[in-house]
């Protein structure tokens, strides 16, 4: 049974909260929060353990003074992966940790998204959360443990937050005993391999009323979910498909564990007893400014918001904001330290009024700022084969969002090598997402990817990965690049669609096409009743104005990836399930549009490498490689093919054309899958060695024969072998004899014979 216990050591000042997670048939996991021993000078420091082996130190620290000139909350989250956590020395040149891995950056985002909304609005002091991975069981995932540790450190720091955040990873594990699947919290890597779907859920406790009774409930704040890599095959074998209902079930299954983790953190904070600190708050505007702006703009602004084109609408609303600012500034300027401060508040109030108008119109009239209905998708445009020499390319447009997808294929040895604490050391399918500033008509820095780009790329990668063919079916490394050329709502889901198109154009035999859609949710009180309106294919403005946004990607039959963030204290199950079904309808519409252009793999580009496989006995691997790589290097040089050998004896041959590949296959088979040559067969061989009694001639890699000196003179006596043939010389020979030890005797023959 899941439970929370507390321990205090007054002598050493240690306080512990231990949460036991009961997974039924799959045993229990223990999450232990400990404070008082490490990092005592941080405002809050908690060491978090998953069972006994995985250990993370989370610290939260705030600056003494607010940052001047900031109109946002300066929160920074950093995750430090220490290689000593896994008993390893970093593989970099300097043998120390460098910039964070992709996994660490994704963990930072996973922590930031649910924790940021818990801080009081108007806080401008710099807050830094640092999570250091100190010990790591290779069977565990640390990212969700880090959410809980970061929340606990923040909760005891005295900073103004609304409460603790609990995070849990749930895996739907399917095995012989559980053919319909069981949800397992904090799954191991082995259980991950058995699962068909995983979901990370973060939430907090809120007070609710039912009649006269008050009770605590879990409000979901963030969801990250994805299907497993082998989900298609598992579903064919009878496992449940990860449908919209499975997602809803996973959310409900996660709530009891989030409740336990939040209670453990709250109990720890009560026992630590740190007093709440006072921080100056900087609200974006005063009630007086808001009221003045609202009286001025409501009617005209509502009219301007009905302009359908984004640029026209933005230009009109911005021009009107400047007009209102000029009109109200003389009235409020004297109340502020500078005209700039007054101007900033008027603009903030204007944006808040605009948000309120849009939300009200959505709830009462199902109005959208571009004129669509709540379930309508913007105009779609699909094209493939845009980039001349790319192996595969596509252009996917949805309204003003425009994504270019480009696919590159290469040898398996080009897969990404991963030097991080995450399970697995290589990645064959890589998805890279670029978001240049011109995509929104702005200027800015270009170069190395920012955290947002890495996060969007990871989401698109997770969406497509379940339909990527296996290494055996398609022995290529695959790099997919998404270029966001225009942005007005969900470039990440546009990237999923562009990827399917581009991969098909490159000839990749996907198990099924995948599409994605971004959804929004707006809620509010209308005539005393809470109304919810789900929006399909949200614009950038609707994303900012809504209470929840979620992105859903999948095939026609099941979900492959989902990401959800909400500001609400809870979403009724019926509302969420209806929104997921609405997203499915949109996904099917997009898939049909894509299928009209390309509905299966094209023929591979002439510029793509041709990769074939040959299986050789494991015992022959060394012979194929040869001493110091002699044989493999000779094969590469002679045929022009690239050759990669796996530990199981699978040989991958990559060549620019079919003839080179066939030549390499023939030579590999001759060496490692040899058919014994027969007496009378002729070869054009190469003299590899001369001795006093004859010349050794290479017939095939690793297969030599001897031409005796007596056979070299065409019937005449030869004093020295080197007088007739020299090393490196080509010579036409015929097999005269093969003795019982397999030694080959050769005789030279004239080419015309």
Swiss-Prot record:
Signal peptide: none annotated. Keywords: Cytoplasm, Magnesium, Metal-binding, Nucleotidyltransferase, RNA-binding, Transferase. Involved in mRNA degradation. Catalyzes the phosphorolysis of single-stranded polyribonucleotides processively in the 3'- to 5'-direction. It is found in: Cytoplasm. SMART domains: KH, S1. HAMAP family: PNPase. GO terms for cellular component: cytosol. Residues 609-668 form the KH domain. Its cofactor is Mg(2+). Its EC number is 2.7.7.8. The keyword Zinc-finger does not apply. Mg(2+) binds at residues 543, 549. It is an enzyme of class 2 (transferase). One of its GO terms (biological process) is RNA processing. This is Polyribonucleotide nucleotidyltransferase. Belongs to the polyribonucleotide nucleotidyltransferase family. It catalyses: RNA(n+1) + phosphate = RNA(n) + a ribonucleoside 5'-diphosphate. Residues 680-749 form the S1 motif domain. GO terms for molecular function: 3'-5'-RNA exonuclease activity; magnesium ion binding; polyribonucleotide nucleotidyltransferase activity; RNA binding. CDD domains: KH-I_PNPase (cd02393), RNase_PH_PNPase_2 (cd11364).
């Amino acid at each position: 049974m899941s439970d929370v216990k507390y321990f205090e050591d007054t002598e050493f000042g240690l306080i512990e909260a231990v949460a036991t997670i009961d997974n039924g048939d799959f045993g229990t996991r223990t999450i232990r929060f400990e404070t008082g021993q490490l990092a005592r000078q941080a405002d809050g420091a908690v060491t978090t353990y998953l069972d006994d082996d995985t250990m993370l130190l989370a610290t939260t620290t705030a600056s003494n003074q607010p940052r001047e000139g900031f109109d946002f909350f300066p929160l920074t989250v950093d995750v430090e992966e220490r290689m000593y956590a896994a008993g390893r020395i970093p593989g970099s040149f300097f043998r120390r940790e460098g910039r964070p891995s992709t996994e660490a950056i994704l963990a930072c985002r996973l922590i930031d998204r649910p924790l940021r909304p818990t801080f009081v609005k108007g806080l401008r002091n710099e807050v830094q959360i640092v999570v250091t991975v100190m010990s790591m069981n290779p069977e565990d995932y640390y990212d969700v443990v880090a959410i809980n540790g970061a929340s606990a450190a923040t909760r005891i720091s005295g900073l103004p937050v609304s409460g603790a955040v609990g995070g849990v990873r749930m895996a739907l594990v399917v095995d012989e005993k559980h053919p319909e699947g069981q949800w397992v919290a904090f799954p191991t890597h082995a259980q991950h391999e058995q699962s068909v779907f995983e979901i990370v859920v973060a939430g907090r406790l809120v007070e609710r009323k039912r009649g006269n009774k008050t009770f605590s409930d879990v409000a979901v704040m963030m969801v990250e979910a994805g299907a497993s890599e082998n989900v298609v095959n598992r579903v064919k074998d009878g496992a449940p498909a990860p449908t919209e209902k499975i997602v809803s079930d996973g959310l409900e299954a996660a709530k009891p564990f989030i409740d336990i983790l939040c209670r453990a953190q709250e109990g720890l904070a009560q026992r630590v007893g740190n007093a709440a600190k006072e921080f100056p708050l900087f609200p974006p505007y005063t009630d007086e400014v808001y009221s003045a702006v609202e009286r001025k703009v409501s009617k005209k602004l509502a009219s301007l918001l009905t302009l359908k084109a984004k640029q026209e609408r933005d230009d009109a609303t911005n021009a009107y904001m400047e007009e209102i600012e000029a009109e109200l500034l003389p009235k409020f300027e004297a109340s502020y330290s500078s005209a700039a401060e007054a101007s900033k508040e008027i603009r903030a109030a204007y944006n808040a009024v605009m948000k309120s108008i849009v939300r009200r119109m959505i709830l009462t009239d199902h109005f959208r700022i571009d004129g669509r209905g709540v379930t309508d998708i913007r105009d779609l445009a699909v094209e493939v084969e845009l980039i001349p020499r790319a192996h595969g390319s596509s252009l996917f447009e949805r309204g003003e969002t425009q994504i270019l997808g480009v696919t590159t294929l290469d040898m398996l040895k080009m897969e990404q090598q991963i030097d991080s604490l995450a399970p697995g050391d290589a990645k064959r399918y890589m998805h890279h997402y670029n978001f240049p500033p011109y995509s929104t008509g702005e200027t800015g820095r270009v170069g190395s990817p920012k955290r947002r780009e890495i996060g969007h790329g990871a989401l698109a990668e997770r969406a497509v990965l379940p339909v990527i063919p296996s290494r055996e079916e398609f022995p290529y490394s695959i790099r997919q690049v998404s270029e966001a050329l225009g942005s007005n709502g969900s470039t990440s889901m546009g990237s999923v669609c562009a990827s399917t198109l581009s991969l098909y154009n490159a000839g990749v035999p996907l198990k099924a096409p995948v599409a994605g859609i971004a959804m929004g949710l707006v809620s509010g009180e209308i005539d005393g009743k809470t109304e919810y309106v789900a929006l399909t294919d949200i614009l950038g403005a609707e994303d900012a104005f809504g209470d929840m946004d979620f992105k859903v990607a999948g095939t026609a039959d099941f979900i492959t990836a989902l990401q959800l963030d909400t500001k609400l204290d809870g979403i009724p199950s019926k509302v969420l399930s209806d929104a997921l079904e609405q997203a499915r309808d949109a996904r099917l519409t997009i898939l049909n549009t894509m299928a009209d252009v390309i509905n299966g793999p094209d023929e591979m580009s002439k510029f793509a490498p041709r990769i074939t496989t040959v299986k050789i006995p494991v015992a022959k691997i060394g012979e194929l490689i040869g001493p110091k790589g002699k044989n493999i290097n000779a094969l590469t040089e002679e045929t022009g093919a690239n050759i990669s050998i796996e530990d199981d004896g699978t040989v991958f041959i990559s060549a620019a054309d079919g003839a080179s590949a066939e030549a390499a296959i023939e030579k590999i088979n001759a060496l490692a899958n040899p058919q014994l040559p027969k007496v009378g067969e002729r070869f054009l061989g190469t003299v590899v060695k001369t001795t006093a009694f004859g010349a050794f001639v290479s017939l095939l890699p690793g297969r030599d024969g001897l031409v005796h000196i007596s056979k070299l003179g065409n019937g005449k006596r030869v004093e020295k072998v080197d007088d007739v043939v020299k090393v490196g010389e080509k010579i036409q020979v015929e097999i005269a004899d093969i003795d019982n030890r397999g030694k080959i005797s050769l005789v030279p023959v004239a080419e015309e014979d």
